[in-house]
Design a protein with these regions (language model features):
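Short internal beta-strands
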Residues: 28-36
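Hydrophobic beta-strand scaffold residues
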Residues: 59-60, 92
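Short acidic low-complexity segments
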Residues: 60-70
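A generic structural signal for well-ordered alpha-helical segments
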Residues: 52-53, 117, 210
Length: 283
């Protein structure tokens, strides 16, 4: 029987890792999740991993409880399922975006930025029956600055993985993890709001949630989605606990993503006066 490397992934963050492995391995198969039904038409929407497989003629299947018989080993990155112990007959390695044992769980990048860490990184480890506790085979530190967005961090990791992939020996050395209780949570929409934050906290949320979110400023029943901010002053700051936040790119209600100042300039004068009173714009 021909043996294959298997990749497990199910969202947009999985794709750069899959692309690197695809460009380096001849015998590759992919396991992903089934399409979700969404929209008014209740149409099935494939995830980005399935789309990449179709575009590049990569064989793929949907996850079920039976491990593939032709698997040599697997690599998982941002996969929506937790593997039961019965599935781990062959070794499966996970790419986790923190320096384990710190920041186990689903949101290590976002949590590190929110906690204003100066360093994080990524870990490749052998999956065991617990969550993010397996033996480590590779780690790489990555600096985080006060200007680092989550998207920047993901890009740093993807570039490093691409550069070092051919030199990573998954079976060369296994390092047991220290026992540290350091877990992250799955964020919900309420976590994205910045209304009650001070300036530092708001900036951290905008940087942390620009992939999973984005951050949100709530105005009555309307949500202004915030993709980025600038430290350069302009005429349309938002006031947070007496401090001025200068937005850069936003998605206003019912509109496409756009430059924030262009959006403000496009408001009619009368609406502008009402809007600034409601959400504390300082025009």
């Amino acid at each position: 029987m021909i043996k294959y490397k298997y990749f497990y992934g199910s969202d947009i963050r999985s794709v750069p890792f899959l692309e690197t492995i695809f460009n380096n391995e001849e015998k590759l198969k992919v396991i992903t999740t089934k399409p979700k039904v969404s929209g008014r038409g209740k149409k099935e929407k494939p995830n980005p991993v399935e789309n990449f497989c179709r575009e590049n003629n990569i064989g793929f299947s949907y996850y079920d409880s039976s491990p593939p018989e032709d698997m040599e080993y697997g690599i998982s990155a941002s996969f929506a399922h937790i593997f039961p112990e019965s599935y781990l007959i062959k070794p499966i390695f996970n790419i986790h975006l923190s320096i384990l044992p710190l920041y186990k769980g689903p949101t290590p990048v976002e949590t590190a930025i929110l906690n204003m860490e100066s360093t994080s990184g990524y870990t490749i480890f052998l999956i065991d029956k617990h969550i993010d506790t397996g033996n480590i085979v590779y780690q790489k530190d990555i600096d985080i600055s006060e200007e680092t967005y989550a998207s920047d961090f993901y890009k740093f990791v993807n570039e490093d993985f691409k550069y070092n992939y051919s030199n990573i020996n998954l079976f060369n050395h296994f390092k047991p993890q220290d026992i540290v209780d350091s877990k992250t949570k799955k964020f919900i929409k309420d976590d994205f709001y910045i209304n009650l934050c001070n300036l530092t906290e708001a900036k951290a949320k905008i940087r942390a949630f620009n992939v999973l979110g984005p951050a949100i400023y709530k105005n009555n029943d309307s949500n202004l989605k915030i993709h980025s901010y600038t430290d350069e002053k302009h005429s349309f700051p938002i006031l947070l606990q007496g401090e001025e936040l200068y937005l850069e790119e936003v998605t206003p209600p019912g509109k496409k993503r756009m430059n924030y100042q262009d959006y403000c300039r496009g408001l009619k004068w009368k609406y502008q006066q009402v809007f600034k009173q409601q959400i504390n714009f300082h025009f």
